[in-house]
Amino acid sequence: KFALFSVLTLLSFHAVFSFTPLHTQHPLDPITKEEFLAVQTIVQNKYPISNNKLAFHYIGVDDPEKDLVLKYETSPTLISIPRKIFVVAIINSQTHEILIDLTIKSIVSDNIHNGYGFPVLSAAEQFLAIDLPLKYPPFIASVNKRGLNISEIVCSSFTMGWFGEEKNSRTVRVDCFMKESTVNIYVRPITGITIVADLDLMKIVEYHDRDTEAVPTAENTEYQVSKQSPPFGPKQHSLTSHQPQGPGFQINGTSVSWANWKFHIGFDVRAGIVISLASIYDLEKHKSRRVLYKGYISELFVPYQDPTEEFYFKTFFDSGEFGFGLSTVSLIPNRDCPPHAQFIDTYIHSADGTPIFLENAICVFEQYGNIMWRHTETGIPNESIEESRTEVDLAIRTVVTVGNYDNVLDWEFKTSGWMKPSIALSGILEIKGTNIKHKDEIKEEIHGKLVSANSIGIYHDHFYIYYLDFDIDGTQNSFEKTSLKTVRIVDGGSKRKSYWTTETQTAKTESDAKITIGLAPAELVVVNPNIKTAVGNEVGYRLIPAIPAHPLLTEDDYPQIRGAFTNYNVWVTPYNRTEKWAGGLYVDHSRGDDTLAVWTKKNREIVNKDIVMWHVVGIHHVPAQEDFPIMPLLSTSFELRPTNFFERNPVLKTLPPRDFTWPGCSN
């Protein structure tokens, strides 16, 4: 699951998450280079590396109290919020939770974690682990037995999960691949070998060579453009993107202003991109109105569906085990983002706490081409009425690459008040080698599809869970489910025999808000029951969910115990500053005792409270030959749409953009 990435040097318009002095940032700003260095110094002063084995596994902003942040938004010069950093470090094989106050440059607390699970893996220890087999005599013997060249082998580390063991060490599986004749290593696995490495001991603690399956051929697996030969695919014509009036958005530090929207962009080494303090200007009320306090992907659960020794452990939690922020890669201008995009750089950290510059981590751009609204009126005699408005969206994009998969993550904003988080998957299938070359040779369950000779693409899922802390016109919100009900007409009062109507229920507790989306239609809305429109409706925002995908593992299966937050498509909890990670704070080798599913057993009240919605977006992936050797985008999305939030269509008075013609060109 671990793969290397190079930080590309690219020319573009940039903003950088870096501020000096330390105390001038917004309370939710990402950690800067200077802050990473300060944290490194403070911790190393207490635990000198000369006589301590110290590794930083998470360095993140300790969320300030929400009420202080909201006061800061209105009176930044009157509110002073201490800048606190939360650190998870492994020191002499013990996991420490260290809280640092950078305002006074000292450690506030230092506690040892004695529970289940381990922190996010570091890149440094994975580098060391994947090098172990190449120097391990039994593995070298297995390679020679297969007639392979050890110099053409690369390895990758994979988290192992938990399968009922009483005790766990910080171990990973190490799988190896052939890089001979192709850089597409994941489609050329060396199967039949089990390698387990202990990350604390940094040695191989278990090794088995079970059987020999063919290594899939390198033929037709190369994806680099420089290695392609004719005939080429469909020709793409160049497109010039030009905004003669300049971009419609402004980036001021970490604050983005666009059209009627204003929001804050944050970045965390575990969550990746974080959207905060999203508010929209109401033209009729002449003020900005709060919508979303914070939104991000809390976890990604990827269980593979092969129970054999080769694959059973592959049930990954990409955010909690590898870190979405740590796995964010540099975006490629004119490829990942359009020519008119602007880029934002940021910093992540290494295992020794050193800041690492990440160029082009985020891009911001406007998208054109859709229709905002339109109507052609033909019902008025002797009049021809045609009105149409162009839709212009604002997109915020990052790409997270965890091993073989690339996750293209967007947040889209529309002037109509919509927000649209979307996910697009590309990259390489997880391939299992086989001696089978044709479908007719399959005589038993292979747990996937034969996508090429000697290559099985394993069935698997992708379950993303979004953390959505709504603040609809304030923090006191409720969650409503409006069901659509069929009514049969029995009194003969109409020529119709049936119609449908609605029935609304307000969720009183967390149990009421556990929603499985299926055939029964329902509207799911977060409302502010204290604020109503002129006609008496509660103001709110509606979730238009992604196409539902439900877990198919049994609830007593160990991976599903750890990933129980996928048991429902929607959850609602009261806001709790410490409940950030749906799979728990410590996910590697976790046992499912600190998850969203466990928290909600308290069945807390959620009526007219500060509440958080959690939405699970899932994809069941049955591989096909078109996914090989590299996948075209597989995408899904959901929408957050104002529902009785405005008095009327908020973009009714939007004027069409001025037509622009290039000099020397004609229509």
UniProtKB/Swiss-Prot annotation:
Reaction equation(s) it catalyzes: a primary methyl amine + O2 + H2O = an aldehyde + H2O2 + NH4(+)
InterPro entries: Cu_Am_ox_TPQ-bd, Cu_amine_oxidase, Cu_amine_oxidase_C, Cu_amine_oxidase_C_sf, Cu_amine_oxidase_N-reg, Cu_amine_oxidase_N2, Cu_amine_oxidase_N3
Residues recorded as bearing 2',4',5'-topaquinone in the entry: Y405
Residues at the catalytic site: D318, Y405
Polar residues bias locations: 218-229
Residues carrying covalently attached carbohydrate according to the record: N149, N252, N382, N576
Family, similarity comment: Belongs to the copper/topaquinone oxidase family.
Disulfide bonds: C155-C176, C337-C363
Keyword Cell membrane (UniProt): no
Region forming the signal peptide: 1-18
Name of the featured protein: Primary amine oxidase
Organism: Lens culinaris (Lentil)
Post-translational modification: Glycosylated; contains two carbohydrate chains per monomer.
Binding site for Cu cation: H460, H462, H621
Binding residue positions for substrate: 316-327, 402-407
Cofactor(s) demanded: Cu cation; Zn(2+); L-topaquinone; Mn(2+)
GO molecular function annotations of the record: copper ion binding; primary methylamine oxidase activity; quinone binding
Subunit comment: Homodimer.
One GO-annotated biological process of the protein: amine metabolic process
